[in-house]
Amino acid sequence: MDVNVGGTENIIEMCKEHNVSKLVYCSSTGAIPEEEKGSIRECEGSIPLDPERIKGCYSLSKAMATNVVLKAAKEGLNACVVHPSGILGPEDFAMGETTKTLVDIINGEMPAGIDGSFNLCDVRDLADGLIGAADKGKSGECYILGNEPVSFKDFTKLVSEESGCKQMKFFLPISAANLIAKILEKKAKKTGKKPLMTTFSVYNLARNNRFDSSKASRELGYTTRSYRETIRDEIRWLKAVGKIA
């Protein structure tokens, strides 16, 4: 909260103090309350901070920070917000969670998948979307930068086809994955080690991942490349830097 909310408040104050021409805040699709069915679109005005609909401390902190930015925009600051979905693509030197999942699948270190879905934008498309928001984004507006949802099963199939690794055969139902995650979280509390799977990560696979990026496409010129292209390019990069054989 101190970084995502307090830090955002500090940045806004600095923008005002130094007459910054524009602020683009990078939020998250996790900050938008989930709709059970249909496509999920940007919130208008402010995000309703309903803990029943915004899951996880990170997402809640992003929602709170987004509201801080939108409030500042109403007060005259030239500021807009982008909501990226999950991020995938080459040159992830920090080895984020999605890249780590990709590497684990290729190296055979993930014995089973989960019967859920992702929504992942290519980091290069995200970068273009951020530039588009800086150039064309309207003050006080929010823009989703996502992709089409892809099932875990289809994702692993693409990884197998592009890397040559064995195709994953077993996919846990969400209910079973959630039960295992709860057990792993309890064990992690005792050992102090990070659990292999969390109830929050299971939720992110089980939730509605149909984020609508049409507003960003219309107003910012946002485009997305195929999952196959992103996965192929990331695998090439991972091989080049020695992360996979």
Where do the model's predicted regions map?
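Conserved Rossmann-fold NAD(P)-dependent oxidoreductase catalytic core, especially the SDR/UDP-sugar
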Residues: 2, 6-56
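Substrate-positioning beta->alpha
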Residues: 10, 64, 97, 114-135, ...
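Flexible, glycine-rich beta-alpha linker
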Residues: 31-33, 77-98
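Short, flexible, mixed-charge acidic loops at enzyme active sites
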Residues: 36-45, 94-104
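A conserved pocket-lining segment of Rossmann-fold NAD(P)-dependent short-chain dehydrogenase/reductase
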Residues: 49-53, 100-121, 125
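Active-site Tyr-X1-5-Lys
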Residues: 53-81
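Mid/C-terminal beta-alpha module of Rossmann-like enzyme folds, strongest
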Residues: 129-196, 213, 218, 228, ...
